[in-house]
């Protein structure tokens, strides 16, 4: 019989119950016992839900109060110094201190989980690291499930992935700690076997990455050691991409089963079917666990049948999602306001598990057993392919006839710079902000009121005009050189634009976990994208009418809108991105026509889009750069195009950033004390040719830096860049800060820039050395 299996279920609950419980606990409104009771209740609800959906292998251990990588670190005793832990069970207060920081101790670093929009906490290890089993969490959760009537399949993050996803304090190779870590995993597996656990799922997602030979040897050593002792059957699971050149390693490991991501790694299947077949189970990830589209059940069933024929029947086949369903919302049934044409095309976690169960049944009993499911899948595919809304002929024609010249500015940057300087008349070290100002309780109340119908649209718009007017007056008084309107009308940097573009849709309850209690409801790009009317022009033009100083137009870039959405899967991502770029191009040129001389197109997710394998980077970077240029290249030479990127490793994509051909880029540099600028500096081998705004204020902290600190950071920037390149700005937008933090911090920032101008003028006049670094001055 084919096994219907799941790799992981969303943790947050249908109505974000986990978020509510966590935030009440952190606020002191819910004690530890009550929080743990709510976690146990949610887990039981999720287990019973999956059981009711006819899933044979229901996972346990996929639930977490914050992050599964942190759970693993705590289980194996990988607690760095400074958190008050001296061995034994890790308390909940220590767990949350690692996640969120406490009493002056910083939280662990957080970064993206592979190429998803989930974030994990990075374990910190050292060469002196000693591991210990603080508590057998998989065993405890298995027993918890048994208490409510289920035998589950415990899920563990594999030892090699755990180490490779960690960082060492001294820069040593985490894999050197494998011999010390393996006894902990062997003990966990032994105790699970003694409990009567039949299967355990060992996740090794690093198999989808470019691995060194040392890492491949580590996998062989690890699973050889785990097989040499009592243990349940191990299902080795990798996901997020093809195994490719790591497939041979995976096939040689002494495990009972292998899971394949056939949504993103379908090319692995032929190799697996051609390889020698020991008595191994094969788990087929036929239902995409990372997107929200209904599966093509007929095509998936055809693939499953091919495998069954090659595998000698269905006795050793599992059907599963491609990866954990952590990355999709819980249940589509609660979405009562979605477009009637869109909803039948979708599948959230619950619906995806129904698809898994249907495929398993169809493989065992034949097509007739799942006739209704197959017909519904076929209807959805036909409707999508023939819909005039999904496939807009006007958009297709525009994309098809866009000439290469669409991506090119009229002149080189050097010529544009002179014309922009003449138009803007800015001082040296011009000051600006990244775009948004604090979203106060008053703003949120007004937005909620207009949503409920308690405030008219006209009243709401008058309120926005009032906030913009106050912001413009205040920026003028402060002495900022290039102003912003404050983005008071915007709820979210992607949602705001998506709500006004054709082709986007939004859910009421389509929440997914970003990290901890932070949840996001990504837009759905379900149809061809176009702009029916201007989006931001009214507010930017209104702000500009209040001042003689330049006001920046503020847009979210095409790559970021793509990356932070659920993207249609019936056409290439590149094509979707180009559609967004053309829609934004219209907005950019309309802003210019309205008198806006500086237009910022933010791309904080530009680097996030990089594929997991380096061999695939160039193709992505080519179309990502092209789409940015399509969006921005339609303006005159004297209109400045700016962009903004968040904290990232820029060295390996500097050529692509330069190729975007923006007139200025602002980046997050405060925490690195300008070290990130090394990638942009003349000695880097790929010097950035245009202007740069290195952030001088860490806006992620409530702390207000003084003028001296900012001046010192600017001095460090001058040691790496020419003076003419440098803009002065915060690290990022100020939406999440409070006005009582913003006003003094920006006043200090303006003072730091003025101080720098005075010193530069003295040097230019008298040839005297300044007291800040000027190695890069020009």
Describe each model-derived feature in a short phrase:
Residues 1-768, 776-778:
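Domain-level signal for soluble alpha/beta catalytic cores
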